[in-house]
Amino acid sequence: MTVEVSRRDILCDEIVELGSEAKFLKLPIGPYLNLLNVTPLPSQIAIINAINNPKYRFVSAAVSRRQGKTYIANIIGQLVSLVPGSNILIMSPNYSLSQISFDLQRNLIKHFDLEVTKDNAKDKVIEISNGSTVRMGSVNQVDSCVGRSYDLIIFDEAALADGKDAFNVALRPTLDKENSKAIFI
């Protein structure tokens, strides 16, 4: 399968290991994927390399269906949550689509036997024992996601939502940390 990447410095055939100061993901993703028994596709490798590259704050991945965009983005989100006190927001066009990521996060947490201090299915918020939170949001109710500072925003199914204003007006200001990033898939 041929993957076309618009940025020449983003590889899609191998995960690039950067120095610890430069990379966004503070934990190595390769061994983590091995523990999950996941062999990433070229499109997933490109997403990993793009988000890890300090040059790019906003990563937009226009990738065909059934390529594991949501899955790899959730793995990236969980890796970020393993850094104490991190806040991750996963946005979807509606709450029924956000349930996919909520279930994925629960399964990843269960797989690695992480201690959960809060698992609120109604509000779709998970807090792990290191103080990190993973929150699901909907473009339809973006106001419920503001007022916090996020380390990572994952905008799932970005092509399905008219979320330009939701991101630019409501969510972009929540990426107020020096190294905070967003992925649009």
List each language-model region with its residue ranges:
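Phosphate/NTP-binding elements of NTP-utilizing enzymes
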Residues: 2-185
